[in-house]
Amino acid sequence: MTNENSIGIEFDFPEGILGFENIKTFIIKDSKHKPFSIMQSINKDVSFLVTSPFNFLNEYLPNIEEKDWSDIDAKAEDEKVILCIINMHVNDYKDITANLKAPIIINKKKLLGKQAICTNEKYSLRHKVFKE
């Protein structure tokens, strides 16, 4: 990925993102706020802050269904990337949360993505990123 002012990498999301099903193409680019990236629709109307859940939760085991991976034609482990959407609508950085229940899964070789629903019940839509 490239810096925030550049184009980034374009990914197709055939099913869109939950709540944004009509938006099918996103660009993922680096953010100046590491370890976060920006996932922005190509028309720039919608954007999300995303990061790897492994940046703050080493043992994230979402149990993503095999069908979800096959929907984006991801078979080999080196093709698979998992990201989570970050909620920054807070007054204090300690209250930043990540959606671990519905991760973004990506086939980085075929440039395809999907929002999956993880079957592991221990994860929530608002997992605190920073421990107090």
UniProtKB/Swiss-Prot annotation:
It comes from Borreliella afzelii (strain PKo) (Borrelia afzelii). The keyword Cytoplasm applies. GO terms for cellular component: cytoplasm. Keywords: Bacterial flagellum biogenesis, Chaperone, Cytoplasm, Translation regulation. The keyword Cytoplasm applies. One of its GO terms (biological process) is bacterial-type flagellum assembly. Signal peptide: none annotated. It comes from the Bacteria. Acts as an anti-CsrA protein, binds CsrA and prevents it from repressing translation of its target genes, one of which is flagellin. Binds to flagellin and participates in the assembly of the flagellum. This is Flagellar assembly factor FliW. Interacts with translational regulator CsrA and flagellin(s). Belongs to the FliW family.
